[in-house]
Amino acid sequence: MASLVKILYIKIRFCLKCFFAKSTSVYDSLRGKKKCLVMLAADYGNLGDVAITYAQEQWLAVQYPEYEIVDVPISKTLSHLKALKNICSSTDIITIVGGGNMSDLYFDIEILRQMVVKAFQNNRIISFPQTLFFSDTLGGKFLKWMAKRTYSKHKNLTITAREIWSFNTMKQISLDCLLLPDIVMTLDKSEPKVERSGITMCLRNDKEASLSKDFVHELRERLSLDFAVADYDTHIDKEGMSVAEREQELEMIWTSCRSSQWVITDRLHGMIFAFITGTPCIVFPNNNYKIEGCYKWIKDCGYVFYLGECNIDDIIKRIGKPVTNKYNEISNIINSKFIQLQKNTSQ
């Protein structure tokens, strides 16, 4: 977790960079048009966040057909915020990409989110489903206080949580919020059908990892006795991707899921990608509650299985058993939840 000094340093640095940003005419053609901005759009290599951005824009295009959906990459936030503010009217809609970064673990993104909310005080703002986690460190407590102060002051802000722990925490700090699934769960990427073979392992190797290297090695060895085992992480080494590049990367990983007999993962969107492609999946917990919390939305689909205890024998047994597929039933429930968001934000 970041120290208070580091958080303050980055906050001041971001504010100065935004204040001294050079003017740009890139958005001038949008002046006078009805716009829906997608702020903090993921143009970096986390395909989970990229998928959230994609799904959010798809949903907005259906719900607000009379609005132009404007993708604002997170990498352009500081340099373009003033220009965007100047071309927006009070009738334009501001949306903020969902995810798992309302925290001091990814404090730089949380600082940017607060800057966006402050910049558009006269606009309707929708913050798509988030996982919230602030540590008990001095830095975490400060950022949590800033979040409460910033978000509670806005008169037309809709905040949404994607699991019950975040929802309850938001309520505890007096934020009015909705409980909704991760927006990626609204997608259907089960087509085109392809022949399935082998197992895809999608496992973390970062600060949220919880599986030991020895466990992963032994699991791979056991699985390799009966299956071809491939690796495909939801994190790729790319920055500053265009919208077309993002969609290409998403199609590649969705195709990988569709062509696998099983996906084994400890990544939230590894689990969700398996769900939306109709792929049997075993998912392990990570070092926070977001996987367990989000799994509750899809636990009855019949082909995605959360294993709280990482036991290799149990994994092998589960893979050997048949699965059912209740995607359509669960998908209808998930999509019905977002009707609530549409009603709340159209008032």
Spans of model-derived segments:
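Active-site anion-handling motifs in enzyme catalytic cores
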Residues: 1-347
